[in-house]
Amino acid sequence: MKTPQGAEEFIAEQKMIRDEETECANSQYNLGVSLMEQGKLDEAIEAFRDAVADSGRMFEGYVNLGYIYFKKGDLEMVVDVNRKAVQIEPRYARGYANLGFAYLQMMKTGEAIEALNKAIELNPEIVQAWSNLTNAYLQNDDVEMAIETGEKMVEMAPDFALGHNNLASAYFNNDEYKKAIEHLDKAIELGFEPHPEFMKVLEPYR
């Protein structure tokens, strides 16, 4: 890990390289990473934008832009840059997972389901994609698919606390309260803190 002084020196060095080589995408990218690590997000955006402009194939630059825009709460831009990432690298599973999560937050449920299924097709081990897909099916009032997806998720990752919480929600929406309590309790056992209202509505069924 770079010390603050070392990081500042590295940033200065990359800026110097950038100024000397106006079309050096790698230096722009390295500069963006360092600025991002320092929390200088607006400067990092500029560096990554320059990097992807200089290199039409640098999908990693779009990936990092997506992370920054998510930190800034700009979901439209998260979608925009991750779309560009998967256009460059169509087998980039996490790009589709990122798209799916952004669409889910934007209540664009159909797009979320499509993107998350694509992410899982490319890399079934992205547990968060399964979790978000469970929520997307719930958002789409497809409880059966939410349960099926959630069960696959906890079978693959039995210690994924959030996954058990989401599966509990799916079972609750299907009036299967015993199974909802079972998975909620498992989530709590694994260190998850469920929403107090969810715990309250399940209490009469214990």
What are these regions (language model features)?
Residues K2-M16, Q38-D50, K71-K84, Q105-K118, ...:
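Structural signature of tandem alpha-helical TPR/SEL1-like repeats
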Residues R57-L122, Q128:
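A generic tandem-repeat structural signature
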Residues N30, N64, N98, N132, ...:
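Canonical tetratricopeptide repeat
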Residues A25-N26, F59-E60, A93-R94, V127-Q128, ...:
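Helix-start (N-cap) detector for alpha-helical repeat units in TPR-like alpha-solenoids
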Residues S169-N173, E193-R206:
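TPR/TPR-like alpha-solenoid helical repeat scaffolds
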